[in-house]
């Protein structure tokens, strides 16, 4: 499921946001009268220009879960710099729960070499050339959040220089 939405905020640049569903699962809660069925949706949104977010929504129907997931995504968007060859500037590692991911920059034309939920997060963020490996658990939510954790560790040179000058 992919949908494009445009955001225009009073003269600001108009970005096109895409959203994708990573996983929809049926979950149950045991209550006094029996079992209560609900759905959990894991959603990723990105603008293909270095901004991406992962969110989770739970509701009694699938459409409501997806809507709640999208609103959760919008609250958790991160931004990071992309190089001119649409890759990351340096290798990074990210962890969330038992999931751990390794992201390494790759040469022009190699494409996205990644799997699972990590691939969806990388594609929607706008990275075109990268090598990625997920270690540990195969849980979709933990791998997506570990990828977000790794991407949030990326810094531009100007911010690295300001950190170095601040520490001196």
From Swiss-Prot:
Subcellular location: Plastid, Chloroplast
InterPro entries: Ribosomal_Su5_D2-typ_SF, Ribosomal_uS5, Ribosomal_uS5_bac-type, Ribosomal_uS5_C, Ribosomal_uS5_N, Ribosomal_uS5_N_CS, Ribsml_uS5_D2-typ_fold_subgr
Domain S5 DRBM intervals: 17-80
Keyword Chloroplast: yes
Gene3D superfamilies: 3.30.160.20, 3.30.230.10
GO BP term, pick one: translation
GO cellular component labels: chloroplast; small ribosomal subunit
Keywords attached to this entry: Chloroplast, Plastid, Ribonucleoprotein, Ribosomal protein, RNA-binding, rRNA-binding
Protein's UniProt keywords contain rRNA-binding: yes
Molecular function GO labels: rRNA binding; structural constituent of ribosome
Family stated for the protein in its record: Belongs to the universal ribosomal protein uS5 family.
HAMAP family reported for this sequence: Ribosomal_uS5_B
Assembly and interaction partners: Part of the 30S ribosomal subunit. Contacts protein S4.
Domain notes: The N-terminal domain interacts with the head of the 30S subunit; the C-terminal domain interacts with the body and contacts protein S4. The interaction surface between S4 and S5 is involved in control of translational fidelity.
Function: With S4 and S12 plays an important role in translational accuracy.
Descriptive protein name: Small ribosomal subunit protein uS5c
Species lineage: Eukaryota, Rhodophyta, Bangiophyceae, Cyanidiales, Cyanidiaceae
């Amino acid at each position: 499921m992919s949908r494009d939405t445009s955001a225009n905020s009073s003269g600001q640049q108009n970005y096109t946001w895409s959203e994708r569903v990573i996983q929809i699962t049926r979950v149950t809660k045991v209550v006094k009268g029996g079992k209560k069925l609900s759905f959990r949706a894991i959603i990723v949104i990105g603008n293909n220009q270095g901004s991406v977010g992962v969110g989770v929504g739970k509701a009694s129907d699938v459409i409501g879960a997806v809507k709640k997931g999208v609103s959760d995504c919008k609250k958790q968007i991160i931004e990071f710099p992309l190089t001119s060859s649409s890759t990351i500037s340096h290798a990074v590692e990210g962890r969330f729960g038992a999931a751990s991911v390794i992201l390494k920059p790759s040469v022009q034309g190699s494409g996205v070499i990644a799997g699972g939920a990590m691939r969806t997060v990388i594609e929607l963020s706008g990275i075109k050339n990268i090598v990625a490996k997920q270690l540990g658990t195969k849980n979709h939510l933990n791998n997506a959040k570990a990828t977000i954790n790794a991407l949030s560790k990326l810094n531009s040179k100007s911010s690295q220089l300001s950190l170095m000058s601040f520490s001196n």
